[in-house]
């Protein structure tokens, strides 16, 4: 079967939820038995989001093969079974870098390099390559129609529609239909102007997804269809909902998947969304609730921890609990004290970089350890737990990470200078290495030690989890820390790197160097988060007055 392409654009304003809409449509098509993947094209000049500020861009989502990508790829993986890869996300920076590399190499035989055709051809090649072997590829273009940055991408997709044939392509445009309280009605003019903007660059949308805080009335949908040159059945009302996992059914109920299949002449069975119905049932019928404190450095923007937030909610679904997340700035722990941690059922310290707020995180780990509160540390959250234990239990009072103090006399955490990737290839790094794209990234095998809490939680001897770090436990000082009671419960495949630590005489204190949040989904959850949330409920029950 030839590959079919759905191109998703956004208009009027940003943050309308193109990624959620694209992922929801993909989940319906997948439920109809189609082989679907989703790509994200980002117009910014950064090569990838790996070195971008989390408070500006949100989290960096890491794929199985180690790509540092946009957080929308996390949405994609949470909605469909297909895993993302390096081919599923690329930026203007990556495209321009590749074109310039080819020019320096002489690939263009002395031609004058221009946006058209060289940049647009590179974009088209990557879209086609990323969609090979798929029935449907959904391609989301970041930004808003009218932005100068996205013009090369839109032009490339316009050309691609001509190249592969309009019968194999569909343009889906998300737009805002605002409700004006003083007028008591929704207004379609912004949508009309957004479509006009698309038409000016040669793109006629085939489907309009109309975002609003309420359902769009039938007469307004007819008006949009008339003025925007689309069939009325292709004007989809997408109102605000209490759960993003309700959107697949909302789109299906309006026949979007049927419209797509008719357009591409795909003969496939009706979508079975019973798994999503189960997710929504568990979400709507909890048997209790827990409050988990997330102590981080980027809490002013919750999207900086998007996958962690979602993984906690998924664990709530697994345990039939509502998970309330209390965000606490680790710097506030330094200035206001651990009183901010009172009343929590569990504590989670997520990943991060740099020294700011680290001492607050260390005090948080100490508070959780001493008060027997369930603790989950992720990446930096593991490293600070190790530092705390080394200082306050193992007698290494000057323990620190060389990331925070290069002259530290007791560096219990240091730069990884050499490791093996999943394929057995040796990677090396030094202090002089670039920051971008040089970390230990992607899926790595982890061996779990028998008799440990981690082994019990996972129920397996070997697991595969995704990493994103350049510092690790210093094995030279590890024996002294282990002698004081800390347990290493997970090691890398070559047994050289510490992956998980835990405290045996604590009800639930586990910290991992990897990022388990990247593989959690609403339908399946994740064993580590599920165990953590269950421990939070057990702690709550044992401390009831």
UniProtKB/Swiss-Prot annotation:
Keywords: ATP-binding, Glutamine amidotransferase, Ligase, Magnesium, Metal-binding, Nucleotide-binding, Pyrimidine biosynthesis. One of its GO terms (biological process) is 'de novo' CTP biosynthetic process. Pathway: Pyrimidine metabolism; CTP biosynthesis via de novo pathway; CTP from UDP: step 2/2. Residues 1-266 are annotated as: Amidoligase domain. The keyword Aminoacyl-tRNA synthetase does not apply. L-glutamine binds at residues 352, 380-383, 403, 470. UTP binds at residues 14, 187-192, 223. Mg(2+) binds at residues 72, 140. Homotetramer. HAMAP family: PyrG. This is CTP synthase.
């Amino acid at each position: 079967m030839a590959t079919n392409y759905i191109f998703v654009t956004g208009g009027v304003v940003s943050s309308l939820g193109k990624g959620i809409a694209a992922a929801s449509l993909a989940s319906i098509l997948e439920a109809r038995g189609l082989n679907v993947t989703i790509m994200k094209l980002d117009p910014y000049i950064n090569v990838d989001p790996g070195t971008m500020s989390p408070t500006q861009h949100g989290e960096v989502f890491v794929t199985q093969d180690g790509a540092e990508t946009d957080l929308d790829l996390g949405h994609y993986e949470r909605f469909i079974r297909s895993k993302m890869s390096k081919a599923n996300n690329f930026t203007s920076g990556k495209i321009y870098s590749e074109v310039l590399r080819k020019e320096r190499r002489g690939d263009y035989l002395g031609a004058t390099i221009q946006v058209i055709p060289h940049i647009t051809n590179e974009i088209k090649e990557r879209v086609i390559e990323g969609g090979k072997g798929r029935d449907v590829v959904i391609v989301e273009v970041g930004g808003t129609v009218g932005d100068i940055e996205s013009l090369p991408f839109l032009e490339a997709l316009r050309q691609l529609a001509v190249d592969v044939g309009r019968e194999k392509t569909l343009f889906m445009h998300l737009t805002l239909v605002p409700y004006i309280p003083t007028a008591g009605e929704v207004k379609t003019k912004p949508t009309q102007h957004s479509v006009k903007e698309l038409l000016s660059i040669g793109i006629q949308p085939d489907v309009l997804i109309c975002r609003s805080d309420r359902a769009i009335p039938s007469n307004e949908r007819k008006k949009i269809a008339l003025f925007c040159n689309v069939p009325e059945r292709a004007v989809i009302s997408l109102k605000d909902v209490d759960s993003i996992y309700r959107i697949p059914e909302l789109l299906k109920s309006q026949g979007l998947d049927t419209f797509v299949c008719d357009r591409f002449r795909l003969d496939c069975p009706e979508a079975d969304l019973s798994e999503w119905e189960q997710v929504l049932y568990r979400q709507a019928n909890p048997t209790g609730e827990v409050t988990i404190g997330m102590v981080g450095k980027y809490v002013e923007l919750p999207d900086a921890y998007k996958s962690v937030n979602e993984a906690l909610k998924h664990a709530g679904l697994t345990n039939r609990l509502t998970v309330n997340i209390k965000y606490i700035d680790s710097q506030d722990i330094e200035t206001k004290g651990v009183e901010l941690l009172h009343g929590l059922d569990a504590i989670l310290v997520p990943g991060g970089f740099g020294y700011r707020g680290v001492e607050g995180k260390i005090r948080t780990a100490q508070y959780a350890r001493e008060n027997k509160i369930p603790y989950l540390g992720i990446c930096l959250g593991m490293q600070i737990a190790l530092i705390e234990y080394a200082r306050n239990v193992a007698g290494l009072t000057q323990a620190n990470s060389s990331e925070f103090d290069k002259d530290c006399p007791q560096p219990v955490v240091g730069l990884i200078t050499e490791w093996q990737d999943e394929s057995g290839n040796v990677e090396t790094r030094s202090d002089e290495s670039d920051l971008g794209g040089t970390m230990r990234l992607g899926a790595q095998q982890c061996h779990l030690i028998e008799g440990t809490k981690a082994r019990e939680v996972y129920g397996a001897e070997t697991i595969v989890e995704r990493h994103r770090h350049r510092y690790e436990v210093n094995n030279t000082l590890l024996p002294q820390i282990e002698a004081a009671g800390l347990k290493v419960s997970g090691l890398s495949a070559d047994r050289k790197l510490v992956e998980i630590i835990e405290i045996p005489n604590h009800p639930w204190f586990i910290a991992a160097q990897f990022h388990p949040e990247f593989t959690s989904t609403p339908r399946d959850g994740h064993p580590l988060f599920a165990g953590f949330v269950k421990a939070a409920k057990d702690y709550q029950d044992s401390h009831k007055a």
